[in-house]
């Protein structure tokens, strides 16, 4: 049976290898025109532009802190955060607060790690941040903080690469940390020390609304803050076998997922930056985060429909009605070439190399952009497609970098609509992706608009970006 099957396949292969029919009409010598399968390859030109999203929803995995100045713009990032209350905890009756310290741990930085930045911290004294509300990076600080209630004794000068307050984690690795002492004579210290018990988070938020953390010196470093905590050191005494015994203890208040944290990002002269970038569109487009500057790509859907259906004529009836084959887009490969990947040593980095391309870029329908993130949707082949920065080689063996997207399913659906638009506008957006693994399958479980610092320079549509299509009909 196996030998017989092999013989049949071998004969079929010989027949196919001897066939000289045009690939656009495979098998046309065997089928009538109405029964033939049509396969066509085409390339369609595109247009691209940059768009300013003004602000993005602040929902980062880590918080940015600092200021950075490059040709991709100058921005300053600071943090508004609540602290989680240890619900149900109360200090011992005779406890006395000795000191309060603020800590934050950072896992990386962007820019010049040897350049100093000065950190200031203030108490939030305006509106209470709402845990159930989404905030954008252009949050109005004046509604939440007057900057009249400093928390620290002095500004804290930090050099990111020196890791002055590093601690060892469970794996034995040193984790960079910054320790800042509160001013024990401040109104903040007196009021916080007077809070003796902690009932609910809501009650605590009314007594202590949170912290505003900013830098007011340095424009060459932005720190990726991973964790923020405030430690209250206190002592109390008790009688033990007739002897007065003193115990030193501490209670830690964390900024975590149980409270609201907002990253405010301010771009200086952003409109001028947008104009400068748009002036370069003959060769390049840009996607810059957290600026919210994205690139849009217009797909010529109407032109595609007309071209595709010109190859799909099945038959013409006596009354002049034309019957068409049902079209399928088998392959629609969009490649986005990236042109600013730095591959040298860190010592050779220039200021404009600090911002590197986003590792993950999503191509989403522009009309669905806001809804996608507001409703925490997941990518699918008909609305949003995720691509990773990929390395390849050119014909000379030199490294090239790109994102790749297969739009076959999306275009098949769009081309079958009754009213096909002239163009379909798509948007390139940097995203952070979370995955989940079930048995042997890994799936995307969440997608958030990335707030990490990145700048992606791509070849523009005017500089040769195109869409390659292979489509068929039967």
Set out the residue ranges of the language-model regions:
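Secreted, disulfide-rich extracellular signaling modules
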Residues: 2-9, 13, 18-474
């Amino acid at each position: 049976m196996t030998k017989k099957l092999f013989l049949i396949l071998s004969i079929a292969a010989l027949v196919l290898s001897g066939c000289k029919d045009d690939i656009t009409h495979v098998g046309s010598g065997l089928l009538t025109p109405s029964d033939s399968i049509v396969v066509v390859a085409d390339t369609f030109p595109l247009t691209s532009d940059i768009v300013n999203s003004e602000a993005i929803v602040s929902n980062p995995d880590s918080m940015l802190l600092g200021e950075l100045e490059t040709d991709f713009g100058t921005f300053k990032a600071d943090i508004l955060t609540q602290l989680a209350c240890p619900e149900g905890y109360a200090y011992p009756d005779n406890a006395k607060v000795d000191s309060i310290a603020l800590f934050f741990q950072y896992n990386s930085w962007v820019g010049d790690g040897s350049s100093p930045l000065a950190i200031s911290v203030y108490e939030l004294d305006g509106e209470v941040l709402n845990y159930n509300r989404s905030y954008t990076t252009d949050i109005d600080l004046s509604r939440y903080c007057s900057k009249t209630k400093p928390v620290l004794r002095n500004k804290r000068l930090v050099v990111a690469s020196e890791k002055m307050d590093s601690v060892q984690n469970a794996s034995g690795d040193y984790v960079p940390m910054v320790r800042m002492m509160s001013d024990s004579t401040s109104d903040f210290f007196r009021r916080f020390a007077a809070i003796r018990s902690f009932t609910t988070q809501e009650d605590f938020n009314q007594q202590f609304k949170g912290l505003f953390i900013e830098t007011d010196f340095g424009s060459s470093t932005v720190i990726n803050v991973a964790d923020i905590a405030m430690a209250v050191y206190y002592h109390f005494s008790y009688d033990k076998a007739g002897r007065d015994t003193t115990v030193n203890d501490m209670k830690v208040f964390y900024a975590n997922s149980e409270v609201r944290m907002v990253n405010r990002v301010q771009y200086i002269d952003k409109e001028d930056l947008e104009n400068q970038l748009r002036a370069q569109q003959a060769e390049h487009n840009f996607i810059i985060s957290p600026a919210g500057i994205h690139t849009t790509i217009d797909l010529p859907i109407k032109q595609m429909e007309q071209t595709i259906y010109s190859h799909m004529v099945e038959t013409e009836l006596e009354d002049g009605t034309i019957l068409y084959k049902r079209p399928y887009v088998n392959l629609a490969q969009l490649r986005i070439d990236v042109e600013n990947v730095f591959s040298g040593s860190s010592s050779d980095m220039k200021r404009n190399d600090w911002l590197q391309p986003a590792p993950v870029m999503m191509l989403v329908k522009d009309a669905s952009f806001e809804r996608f993130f507001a409703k925490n949707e997941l990518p699918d082949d008909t609305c949003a497609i995720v691509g990773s920065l990929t390395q390849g080689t050119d014909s000379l063996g030199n490294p090239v970098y790109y994102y790749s997207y297969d739009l076959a399913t999306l275009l098949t659906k769009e081309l079958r609509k009754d009213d096909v638009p002239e163009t379909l506008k798509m948007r390139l957006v940097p995203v952070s992706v979370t995955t989940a693994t079930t048995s042997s399958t890994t799936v995307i479980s969440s997608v958030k608009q990335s707030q990490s610092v990145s700048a992606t320079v791509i070849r523009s549509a005017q500089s040769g970006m195109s869409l390659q299509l292979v489509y068929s009909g039967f």
